[in-house]
């Protein structure tokens, strides 16, 4: 067995009261922060993804599918104009 590095063992850490005091606050806080991030719609704004009611508009009900092999840029321009 090699020498000690001076670090506490994992069993010592998870059985300490200090560990559970810290983590009983931080783990629920992270869960609540994530839930608020998604439920308020901020996640849609930060990552730029459309909200569920914005995928299909009144003017564009079809799927934006590239079908032309030789003119994909024209189709992309047409799709981007409809946004």
Curated annotation (Swiss-Prot):
Membrane topology: Single-pass membrane protein
GO cellular component: chloroplast thylakoid membrane; photosystem II reaction center
GO biological process: photosynthetic electron transport chain
Keyword Ligase: no
Keywords from the UniProt entry: Chloroplast, Electron transport, Heme, Iron, Membrane, Metal-binding, Photosynthesis, Photosystem II, Plastid, Thylakoid, Transmembrane, Transmembrane helix, Transport
SUPFAM superfamilies (UniProt xref): Cytochrome b559 subunits (SSF161045)
InterPro entries from the UniProt entry: PSII_cyt_b559_asu, PSII_cyt_b559_asu_sf, PSII_cyt_b559_CS, PSII_cyt_b559_N, PSII_cytb559_asu_lum
Cofactor: heme b
Places the protein is found: Plastid, Chloroplast thylakoid membrane
Manner of cofactor binding, per the entry note: With its partner (PsbF) binds heme. PSII binds additional chlorophylls, carotenoids and specific lipids.
GO molecular function, one term: heme binding
Role played: This b-type cytochrome is tightly associated with the reaction center of photosystem II (PSII), and is essential for PSII function. PSII is a light-driven water:plastoquinone oxidoreductase that uses light energy to abstract electrons from H(2)O, generating O(2) and a proton gradient subsequently used for ATP formation. It consists of a core antenna complex that captures photons, and an electron transfer chain that converts photonic excitation into a charge separation.
Subunit composition and interactions: Heterodimer of an alpha subunit and a beta subunit. PSII is composed of 1 copy each of membrane proteins PsbA, PsbB, PsbC, PsbD, PsbE, PsbF, PsbH, PsbI, PsbJ, PsbK, PsbL, PsbM, PsbT, PsbX, PsbY, PsbZ, Psb30/Ycf12, at least 3 peripheral proteins of the oxygen-evolving complex and a large number of cofactors. It forms dimeric complexes.
Name of the protein described by the UniProt record: Cytochrome b559 subunit alpha
Species of the source: Nicotiana tabacum (Common tobacco)
Lineage: Eukaryota, Viridiplantae, Streptophyta, Embryophyta, Tracheophyta
């Amino acid at each position: 067995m090699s020498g000690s590095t001076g670090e506490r063992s994992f069993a010592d850490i998870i059985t300490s009261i200090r560990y559970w005091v810290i983590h009983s606050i931080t783990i629920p806080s992270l869960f609540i922060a994530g839930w608020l991030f998604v439920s308020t719609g901020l996640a849609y704004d930060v990552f730029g993804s459309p909200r569920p009611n914005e995928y299909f508009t009144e003017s564009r009900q079809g799927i934006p599918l590239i079908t032309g092999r030789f003119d994909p840029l024209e189709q992309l321009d047409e799709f981007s104009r409809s946004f």
